[in-house]
Amino acid sequence: MATRHQVRNAVVSLLYAKEMGSEMNDFVSEYLEEKRIRNDQRKFADKLFNGVCKNVNQIDNELDKYLNEYKISQIGTVERAILRLGAYEIMYEAIDKAIIINEAIELAKELAGESSPKFINGVLDRIGKVK
């Protein structure tokens, strides 16, 4: 059974694939099955992925407020996916913000550039303080 961290990792990968223009209809189901994300964890993955996709404009507007000299469109694709997922969970889910931010930092360490964890921590921490 997949952990929530593994689910979030898969959701970041799906958000990345969507951003890169992949056809998502069958891909989401196939990818989650390949990663052995099933049952309750599958529902959690679907909720996160669909929630980010449905609310991406509001999420991006919120992120833009805290990116200082950047816009969300200027951020690397992997970092953007991690930020969107973290911001979605802070804005729309009743999960401890410290857990969400820590998960995002861990995802950045695994998937993104060397300076990304600190950057992602700073942005999500600022969002978490006002939400």
Swiss-Prot record:
It comes from Campylobacter hominis (strain ATCC BAA-381 / DSM 21671 / CCUG 45161 / LMG 19568 / NCTC 13146 / CH001A). Involved in transcription antitermination. Required for transcription of ribosomal RNA (rRNA) genes. Binds specifically to the boxA antiterminator sequence of the ribosomal RNA (rrn) operons. Pfam families: NusB (PF01029). GO terms for molecular function: RNA binding. The gene is nusB. Belongs to the NusB family. Coiled coil: none annotated. This is Transcription antitermination protein NusB. The keyword Transcription regulation applies.
